[in-house]
Amino acid sequence: MTNIFKDSRRDLRERAFQTLFALEFGGEALDQAYFAYTYDKPIDEETEVDLPSFLLSLVTGVREELPQLDSQIEEKLKEGWSLSRLIMTDRTLLRLGLYEITSFEETPGRVAINEIIEIAKKYSDKTSAKFINGVLSQFVTDEA
């Protein structure tokens, strides 16, 4: 049975993750976001779909701030580790989580982290979820 997302912020974060992950392989951001948003929705080719602004903000924001996000994440990794050493899923989730923590003041940092952890549990494993929690928590602690 197909899971039709309800456009909650949690669902849109997951769609943003799917979009950003797909963009690692190439393509246009808007095309990838459209696909991630609509692939499991019962729509026909003639239906015009407006992508939610939260989804677009996450995707475009991460893409625009990628070098800064990567630099900030690299600073928090243990010695001997780099972003290139991480699996693509974890790298994408760290970028998405950090972007929301630093750019969406209306979202408490801990909420953003918990949401990313739930996505990590679905698309990665418990070890990755703990790792992502550990890295992103450093940004929330630093801001407090």
Swiss-Prot record:
Disulfide-linked positions: none
Any Pfam family the entry gives: NusB
GO molecular function: RNA binding
Biological processes per GO annotation: DNA-templated transcription termination; transcription antitermination
InterPro entries: NusB-like_sf, NusB_fam, NusB_RsmB_TIM44
Keyword list, A-Z: RNA-binding, Transcription, Transcription antitermination, Transcription regulation
Keyword Nucleotide-binding: no
A GO term from the CC aspect: cytosol
Family the entry assigns: Belongs to the NusB family.
NCBIfam families documented for this protein: nusB (TIGR01951), PRK00202.1-1 (NF001223)
Role: Involved in transcription antitermination. Required for transcription of ribosomal RNA (rRNA) genes. Binds specifically to the boxA antiterminator sequence of the ribosomal RNA (rrn) operons.
Protein name: Transcription antitermination protein NusB
Originating organism: Streptococcus thermophilus (strain ATCC BAA-250 / LMG 18311)
Phylogenetic lineage: Bacteria, Bacillati, Bacillota, Bacilli, Lactobacillales
